[in-house]
């Protein structure tokens, strides 16, 4: 009888904790968010295929696109990788001097202090566009994986079509 009472007590505590987390939007119930003001930001510069500089309140802010990894072009001590220039040029062509919206996931910054975001150009997520064009690999660092399935599906389409980095 004592084992049953202890089990019920533990279950009740777990339920209370989960309810508290649900009410506060915390723990497993924490959601990603777009910029709370719904503002768009001017892309001032493209660093490489998956990193941009935006103007946020008059300050430059470095933004790393979540869920994609483009071939390197500017990484110190690393040679320019195949399709790196193509990915950088594609991002420059589509985002430079454009206004974008940012959608954040669970962790807003990476260990280098860059803002982590899904970048929206109109109603299209640019992160997906890079993967769909075969200019980026799907790459996720949990817990930032809200659009994992969508980006991985875009990569599979590019692989099937043998686009760019998936060319044989």
UniProtKB/Swiss-Prot annotation:
UniProt-annotated location(s): Secreted
Pfam families, per database record: SNase
Primary location group: secreted
Superkingdom of the organism of origin: Bacteria
Secreted as UniProt keyword: yes
Signal sequence extent: 1-27
Top EC group: hydrolase
Protein name from the UniProt record: Thermonuclease
Lineage: Bacteria, Bacillati, Bacillota, Bacilli, Bacillales
Chain's gene name: nucI
